[in-house]
Amino acid sequence: MKRTRRALPANYDPVYPYDAPGSSTQPPFFNNKQGLTESPPGTLAVNVSPPLTFSTLGAIKLSTGPGLTLNEGKLQASLGPGLITNTEGQITVENVNKVLSFTSPLHKNENTVSLALGDGLEDENGTLKVTFPTPPPPLQFSPPLTKTGGTVSLPLQDSMQVTNGKLGVKPTTYAPPLKKTDQQVSLQVGSGLTVINEQLQAVQPPATTYNEPLSKTDNSVSLQVGAGLAVQSGALVATPPPPLTFTSPLEKNENTVSLQVGAGLSVQNNALVATPPPPLTFAYPLVKNDNHVALSAGSGLRISGGSLTVATGPGLSHQNGTIGAVVGAGLKFENNAILAKLGNGLTIRDGAIEATQPPAAPITLWTGPGPSINGFINDTPVIRCFICLTRDSNLVTVNASFVGEGGYRIVSPTQSQFSLIMEFDQFGQLMSTGNINSTTTWGEKPWGNNTVQPRPSHTWKLCMPNREVYSTPAATISRCGLDSIAVDGAPSRSIDCMLIINKPKGVATYTLTFRFLNFNRLSGGTLFKTDVLTFTYVGENQ
């Protein structure tokens, strides 16, 4: 009998026919579809599938899950407290009197337990589902409210501020001689000054006139003296008479002295008598009252102690025989004129007082040459930040470098992005709300040394980003090498640093955000020691 040749498989390789072992052609023969198999090839084994498996001793066993157990070779349910098996092999409650109780929102009706549904819930094909109301239309914001991302903010002008979460007007203080009343600012003027047509002017005293024996020469008043009188050491004295001589109307004839009389006089019975003169008339300011002649004093003059004096009002006084104006604080005399005293930062332009602009000198704010660990991430100081802001003309130049410490000393390609933020108030002073907030190592750099002057100045504002130019956040990105000197500038040792200008942040007026990106360009762990980064932006106005 001729043996039938077995057909070869389609993938049979006559060159390398031994890749996989073939089935055994030796007895015993078996049907692999009736519980037996070759595993491994050439070895007869029992073909089992879950829940049947083999024990550690090679015996066939039944795998059991939770709630099932084997007891003396029999599979049975594992019963918990309160459950038993009755005589019919059914699982039942051990004590029917101990039934389950239900509380809201569960309710039992005969043999059915149901769930009470309130608003916002519904039963959909036996599944509890939450129903959501139709969402309202999106909110629209109009100026002065602005929306950036998920934040609504209110831009503030210089005259406004936020205190304890409330919007208010920034109070303005005024020093004498300026005074604020209600909504007006006025200049308090003392005696001798007045405001005419919104200009400060001096009140001129009335002109003074002098009658003999008083006479005025330039700015001096003098007393004219006649014979027998003189002024010595500022006092009026009588001079000794010269030898007795007689002049008209006296006449000496030998030892007789006679009086020559003229019109209006005569000698009668050895007595000098007056002949009635014609009636006298008096012109203003002289007036005759009965037998007295008096001087009538007009406005600005008065008679005191028998003397004619000038009446002085507020702002005028008698000083060393002259009348002068009395000036208060903030005023002075210069070249016989009353002028306002001006302190630093004030000048007079077109007859009005105005503040002067400070000279445009370069200003530098910095952390000092060797700052402390002043950068915080998750409230932990881990970055040593050197930052220098220099205002020259209208531009501010930023020089910065960063060195990691602790957990950020070495960074890897899986490092997450992170930001270091400086927040400033409306005066350009560093706030404590950012994560670069060490005010002990932030201030102004003097010209002559490398110290930090932390005392704030009104010029610090000049180093801030111009809010009108950067009314919305602006950004610039720069390639940043890490440990460049040690790795000789290898391109696989660089990341990106993005400077974000004036990104809204809390109550801060100005912000500078240094964001470090693209760590996945690193080829491995690298020392976080950045190159010196340089940025430029337009500075704020004074």
Curated annotation (Swiss-Prot):
Its main location: virion. Induction: Expressed in the late phase of the viral replicative cycle. It comes from the Viruses. Signal peptide: none annotated. Pfam families: Adeno_knob, Adeno_shaft. Residues 1-24 are annotated as: Disordered. Belongs to the adenoviridae fiber family. This is Fiber protein. It comes from Canine adenovirus serotype 2 (strain Toronto A 26-61). The lineage of its organism: Viruses, Varidnaviria, Bamfordvirae, Preplasmiviricota, Tectiliviricetes.
